[in-house]
Amino acid sequence: SSVEVIDELYKSETATNFNNKSIAWLLKNYSRIYDDPDMALDLYTRQCSIGVTARQLAVAAATIAFDGVNPVTKQTVFKPDLGTRIASMMATVGFYEHTGDWLFNTGLPAKTGVGGGIMGVVPGVMGVAAFAPPLDDAGNSVKAQAALSDIVGRLNLNIFHPRKSILAEQA
């Protein structure tokens, strides 16, 4: 299935992404962006504004959880070592300034999006996703956080808890 840029979201993000613009030019100053920073920022903003369904987001999360193997098509779409790298990045920066609290409370590596989506990864087990506005002060969906937190709790998916998940018990 295809994905498209949500024009309204793209325009909204473009009108308010002053911090990202500053970061792009700072990266250019330190030779970490090798081309036009405004062009790089526009590309980044467009990819942040792509519309997907909850199912598409969950399949993407599961692909990360299964080290690059899409669970629907069974195709390998990226190198296996990238799954761990991506999940680690999600665990450390996926919720912006709320990342530490989120990870402590849920134990779920996750990434939020400005459209109200959140995708979470339980390495080797599953991917999960939820969509729901409104966003909190850090730009994270309030209701999607509650939904994923509930799922993690009910299924014992916290990656820091040594007990088995009920999913593992059913296998």
Give each language-model segment a name:
Residues W25-R32, T63-F66, T92-F95:
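Glycine-rich, acidic and aromatic/proline-enriched surface loops and short helix-turn segments
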Residues Y30, D36, Y44-C48, T53-R55, ...:
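Surface-exposed loop/turn and secondary-structure junction residues enriched for glycine/proline
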Residues D7-Y10, L27, T45-S49, Q56, ...:
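Solvent-exposed, flexible loop/coil residues
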Residues S1-Q47:
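Active-site-adjacent helix/loop patches that line small-molecule binding or acyl-intermediate pockets
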Residues F18, S22, D35, M39, ...:
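Conserved active-site and cofactor/substrate-binding residues in soluble primary-metabolism enzymes
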Residues F66-A171:
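Structured C-terminal helix/loop/strand segments within mature extracytoplasmic catalytic/sensor domains
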